[in-house]
A protein has these predicted regions:
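PLP-dependent amino-acid enzyme catalytic core
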Residues: 1-468
């Protein structure tokens, strides 16, 4: 399996290259040169697989010779041994919608499913090479905690996590900042999540800096995270009783990585009818799907902070597909975004996008009302992001018996207590291990959103860590 950049199809790379570099040197994102296909018979043969077995089948067609079969199985087994539910992913039926519980990992978010695998892949490769690596990531709340849990105490790794100051929930922040391992650095940036993402991308684009600190990343742009997320689309399809029905899946969407994994699953042969882009009032993607105009604007804070995003970092991958893999067109669109702060899809490109996706935004009032209604009718508490996915699916039209409906639950409700109290007038249930973080010491530094200041801080910490 080989990969190329969305901005240059001439150079190809191995999975190991793609995994360790995360972002292509030309600023593009890595994608496979071809998508592996599973026949309907192959898919049905996996019906009784455990999540770990299915994860191996999916990863095995993407990793090439980066890991031996025994190594890959060991990585997957170790990764999911830390989950609180032995099924890893569970389903709950509400109003004929299968709600997909993706929050049974150590930091209570869907990010754990991919991040634990990434952490163990890094450990495997770096233990063999003895090379040191510095991972830098931006988080709107959940990625950071998942990355820190997966990478803490790893021998050849440092992890630097940027989060927007005062724009993540206290639970989200404490899941990051109470981890005191010496290879973990939490940085609160004065600004928005988009500012954090911009800083990370600029560091990636600075080849001299990137090479000097051996930089890599675990944000959703890392292809391995996409592969790990493909797995649960296959898993939930095969957990339903009537597998002859095509799927409609609603995905709470911020950076477009989770829903893009669904798109790849469809290209691999999974019978997905539509993928629903569910967003809050920061509805850039809904507008783009309607008009073809991609025009980021100011981020407006919401009760669903992980979706308070205006620049979806994985959207370039779907651009590459809807432009029929014309890298020159992708470069032109991304240059327009950089220079004019927007781009316009043509009719063919917009039609290609609409062929696979629907989009619905959900207001703050609708989000809280959905949490309230589901709790009153089913005694189950949705987190705000999952509530947006649930409501977006309802907005897509009346549910037909011809399809199977799924809503991805991306986080545990206890991570967003203020929103839950606003909706149902009571605190969400909280696992015991989460209660303990509120009495633990925190460690983080606050920095201005200045690239040079940030780079200087990271270089100093890398130097101190190397000498110590």
């Amino acid at each position: 399996m080989l990969y190329f950049s969305t901005r240059d199809k001439q150079r190809t790379f191995s999975f190991k290259d793609v995994f360790l570099n995360a972002l292509a040197s030309d600023g593009g994102l890595y994608v496979p040169t071809s998508i592996p296909k599973f026949s309907p018979e192959k898919i049905q043969s996996m019906k009784n697989y455990t999540f770990q077995e299915m994860s191996y089948e999916i990863f095995n067609v993407f990793v090439g010779d980066a890991f031996s079969p025994e190594e890959l199985k060991g990585i997957i087994s170790k990764s999911y041994s830390v989950f609180r539910n032995e099924k890893i992913v569970d389903l709950k039926l509400i109003d004929n919608i299968s709600c997909v519980e993706l929050f049974h990992g150590p930091t209570l978010a869907f990010k754990d499913i991919a991040m634990q695998v990434l952490g163990n892949m890094y450990e495997n490769l770096l233990n063999k090479s003895k090379n040191k690596m510095n991972l830098i990531t931006a988080t709107s709340g959940d990625t950071g905690a998942a990355a820190i849990d997966a990478l803490k105490s790893k021998k050849y790794l440092n992890i630097f996590v940027l989060h927007p100051e005062n724009k993540v929930s206290e639970t989200q922040r404490r899941l990051m900042t109470t981890v005191l391992d010496k290879n973990v650095y939490n940085i609160a940036i004065k600004g928005t999540f988009d500012d954090c993402q911009y800083l990370v991308k600029e560091m990636f684009n600075d080849q001299k800096f990137r090479n000097s600190i051996q930089m890599s990343g675990v944000n959703s742009i890392n292809w391995a995270r996409i592969v790990a997320q493909i797995v649960y689309y296959f898993f939930i399809y095969l957990r339903q009783k009537e597998t002859e029905k095509r799927m409609i899946v609603s995905v709470p969407t911020g950076n477009f990585g989770d829903i893009y994994a669904g798109y790849i699953a469809k290209q691999m042969g999974l019978p997905i009818e539509k993928l629903i882009i569910a967003s809050n009032h920061n509805n850039l993607l809904e507008k783009c799907l309607s008009t073809g105009l991609y025009q980021p604007s100011k981020v407006n804070p919401s009760v669903s902070p992980s979706m308070d995003i205006q620049v979806a970092s994985n959207f370039e991958r779907i651009l590459f597909e809807i432009c029929n893999q014309d890298e020159s067109r992708v470069v032109a669109l991304m240059n327009n975004l950089k220079n004019k702060k927007e781009f316009q899809l043509n009719k063919t490109e917009l039609s290609n996008l609409q062929e696979n996706f629907l989009a619905h935004s959900v207001s703050e009032e609708e989000t809280l009302q959905t949490i309230k209604e589901v709790y009153q009718e089913h005694n189950f508490v949705l987190d705000p992001h999952s509530a947006i996915g649930f409501k977006a699916l309802k907005k897509s039209g009346s549910l037909s018996d011809n399809f199977s409906y799924f809503c991805l639950e991306t986080a545990h409700a206890c991570k967003f207590p203020d929103a839950i109290v606003s909706a149902i007038d009571k605190e969400p249930p909280m696992p015991d291990f989460v209660k303990k973080i509120f009495s633990k010491e925190e460690s983080f530094i606050v920095l201005d959103g200045n690239l040079e200041i940030l780079k200087s801080y990271i270089e100093k910490k890398v130097s101190n860590n190397s000498s110590g």
